[in-house]
């Protein structure tokens, strides 16, 4: 009987100990997250959806075949865009798309990328914004560099600007007017 009482007393003491710890933790700690120092109360521009992920490829037909024949995606014909120095194949993924990029012409921005990355790879991500002019001005104030001084017309016929990868965690980010 003594053992049972002793075990019950230990259990009651342990329960009491744990309930005191739980109480002090609940009272002594705050789990709220402080507001970000970069958050503004009324932003002048807003991020939209992911428009596309662009992948530089050394063999456009082979890459197209993979997405079309192996994964079953809807894949466009090759679209030459000489003003941008690329040939593009658009891969429809339902909620977004991919752009398969291949160099076109001697001044292609993709040539240097493929020289460094022989097998190809992710080139950039494109995110829509509701006001590209306001976004550019705001990002300049925040010391985020862009690859051009102002937005230019992109492959989709809309204004775009590329942000410097060194200011974006190593990722080339394209902002596109929604």
Swiss-Prot record:
Keyword DNA-binding annotated: no
Reactions that this protein is recorded to catalyse: (R)-methylmalonyl-CoA = (S)-methylmalonyl-CoA
The keyword Aminoacyl-tRNA synthetase appears for this protein: no
Binding site for Co(2+): 52, 124, 174
Domain of life: Eukaryota
Residue range covered by the transit peptide: 1-38
EC number assigned by the record: 5.1.99.1
Keywords noted in UniProt: Acetylation, Cobalt, Isomerase, Metal-binding, Mitochondrion, Transit peptide
Pfam family membership, one: Glyoxalase_4
Domain VOC: 49-178
Record's subcellular location: Mitochondrion
InterPro entries linked to this entry: Glyas_Bleomycin-R_OHBP_Dase (IPR029068), MeMalonyl-CoA_epimerase (IPR017515), MMCE/EMCE_epimerase (IPR051785), VOC (IPR037523)
BP GO terms, sorted: L-methylmalonyl-CoA metabolic process
Family: Belongs to the methylmalonyl-CoA epimerase family.
Functional description taken from the UniProt entry: Methylmalonyl-CoA epimerase involved in propionyl-CoA metabolism.
Name of the protein this chain belongs to: Methylmalonyl-CoA epimerase, mitochondrial
Native organism: Mus musculus
Underlying gene: Mcee
């Amino acid at each position: 009987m003594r053992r049972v009482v002793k075990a019950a007393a230990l259990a009651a003491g342990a329960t009491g100990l744990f309930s005191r710890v739980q109480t002090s933790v609940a009272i002594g700690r705050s789990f709220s997250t402080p507001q970000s120092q970069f958050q503004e109360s009324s932003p002048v521009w807003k991020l939209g959806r992911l428009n596309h992920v662009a992948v530089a490829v050394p063999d456009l037909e082979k890459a197209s075949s993979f997405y079309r024949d192996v994964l079953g995606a809807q894949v466009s014909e090759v679209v030459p865009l000489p003003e941008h120095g690329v040939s593009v194949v658009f891969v429809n993924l339902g909620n977004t798309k991919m752009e398969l990029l291949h160099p076109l012409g001697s001044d292609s921005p993709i040539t240097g990328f493929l020289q460094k990355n022989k097998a190809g790879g992710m080139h950039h991500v494109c995110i829509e914004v509701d006001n590209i002019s306001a976004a550019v001005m705001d990002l300049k104030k925040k010391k985020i560099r862009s690859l051009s001084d102002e937005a230019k017309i992109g492959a989709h016929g809309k204004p775009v600007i590329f942000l410097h990868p060194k200011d974006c965690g190593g990722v080339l980010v394209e902002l596109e007017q929604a």
